[in-house]
């Protein structure tokens, strides 16, 4: 049985992925520090423990003791806005935490001849930053896109990405870099899918139909976390060490489609009210990426956005009951 260790198991992706790995025959252990989801909802048979990735000594001890076959590194300060407020913390977690993990793997390989785990680090499309303005729907950015991050979070993820490449080139660590575009899951609440779904539940209970919105003209590709899980599994099976892979939905649509899908799921015809507070100072008209590289490994996207928002709406309907 292949042993997997997942950092950031208390996050949206991590909480889904530990269960997905178990269903696919892995022995799974996950760590968390400041969960952004309710970890009580995770399958209780999966071992979870608390670990701050900034605690390099504890990480060193854990990797050397457990010797996982594959490590999925999700743990991060993962929001751009807080990265402006506290760039020090963002760098300590995202950059320092990655260095600590890679150093732990390097030490374990030295102490245990023949031990050679895969390290799959989840970076972000935010590393492309300002370069994305040069692309169109007919010419989406692939993994050769320049790295021009526009905020401390993006810079920290670019550093994580490049550190993995450096440890691969210099020490032979089987590091794979994931450049993840927009992704959502049923238990994520701080994005348009979760926010709209939660408010739709609240409106349904009071007979309301006024939905406050921001910019709905922007085009996005929003991946279902269940499709992300299958992509990450394929990378353990077939991904090449040292390589970077974009992961993004191939379904690109304006944000008006979110409202249309929510109306289909809820049966509510929403009256849209523009709220200046929901508009971003800078909002990219298009945010999507080219995923031909991972598709060549056999990854197939299965879920439509309607499936995603229905699962999210039903989740918050139960959660807020």
Regions found by a protein language model. Give the residues of each.
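Non-catalytic, hydrophobic alpha-helical segments
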Residues: 228, 232, 247, 258, ...
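Rossmann-fold cofactor-recognition segment
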Residues: 43-54
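NAD(P)H-binding glycine-rich loop region in Rossmannoid oxidoreductase-like domains
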Residues: 53-93
